[in-house]
Amino acid sequence: WLQEQRVLDVEKGALLALTHGLSACGDEHAIFAFTSRRRTSVSVATIKDFGEPLGAKVIRRIQAIKPGQYTRIGAAVRHVTAKLKERPHRHRLLMVLTDGKPNDIDQYEGRYGIEDTRMAIREARKAGLRVFGVTVDAHAREYFPYIFGRGAYAIFPSIDRLPAALPAIYRHVTR
């Protein structure tokens, strides 16, 4: 909860706004959600796949996203990077929307989680992806700039701005 709103509900609203905008512009995109419980149990779910039209099924999948367990961001970034590398497009963007610091119950806490996520971001960029991070974590100034780098992240301590901000961030990052 943040500012009397469930963070996940606001994130889902922001995803809906963004996917409607991208679909209206004809920009091919996919949406993935992830959760983890140890390094051997990282789940990345496809909410909307590339080429899949935005319709009632996708909207229901977005609305059905539930809170997961832990936030092993590095593994999720590597998984989605592999999918994006398969895409034939010249411009490929990986936008990471998260509500917290990289963590898990098996030593993926603190410095290790931050360094692994930072390395996954570097690997994605080396593979030709543009990567941009978005978070609503009020403490993100302590680690988010280090993970994503200068000009490649946005921190929203006021969560109510997120739904309008995601489409604006996309326009800014892709111009």
What is each PLM-predicted segment?
Residues W1-R175:
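Acidic, glycine-rich A-domain
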